[in-house]
Amino acid sequence: MVRMPCSLYMREPHSHRRAGPLGALGTRRSASSEGSFQSEGPTRPMRTRRRRFRIAFRVAKVLLVIVVLFAVAVGLLFLLTPSAGQATALVRAQARDRHITYPGPPVPAYFAQALVATEDHRFYSDPGVDPLAMGRVVISWITGREDQGGSTIDQQLAKNLYTGGHSGFTEDLEQLAMAVKLNQTYSRPQILRMYAEVAYYGHGYYGLDAASCGYFGRPPDRLTLVQAAMLAGVVNAPSYDDPLVYPRQARTRLVHVIGRMAAVGYLTRAEETAALNAPLGLSAVRGCA
């Protein structure tokens, strides 16, 4: 028997790893398939951004619809609310009920400056309402919370004259409409004078004349800067800032008012310092001599 060499039965080492055309093609296909799998579709951060954008867009559309409906409601109220031409008659009626005279003395410059600086620093340029106030009313309606934002002087006057001092969604809408009407009907000095006469100053005093005589024993035209600033500041929270009952709170409020007058340019820093160091001069005797 002839024996064959062993080498004929042995495979060449690593011959099974040789990459033929099909093997190379298969390798390339695998790499291609892997690459296409990795690039298939947007990445997760991109999908998250798109989802957030869609949500924000939907929320914006809902808010836009609410604002449009709100504007329509204000427009209807503008047509349905009474004329602002009767405002002076309403002020006179309130003054008569409280045994005070309207029109009273002119509003002193210091009082007007302090009131505008603290309550409505755009009083001489705004249309009677703060554009942001409309948004606050909508938010308060959606959340069910009372609007704590600041109101213009025209809005506060409308609140006192037309809604009985009450607040609520419909009352706030009416106040916005009437504030615009008041702004279109009366001059700025007339608005200030009406406001000064119907405002409550605490301690039972309605009207600037009664408050000036009650707290300081002098008419409004003789008020000092610090006295006028105190009266302008107390109308925001008359029961809480009553200087005869809560002098510490009244002092804090006075410092704020004086600071606002300086911030908007009515007072220099030297005048601000002098006012903060000036005596308030509360009278022990109620009423003007």
Predicted feature residues:
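Juxtamembrane regions of bacterial inner-membrane/periplasmic proteins
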Residues: V2-A289
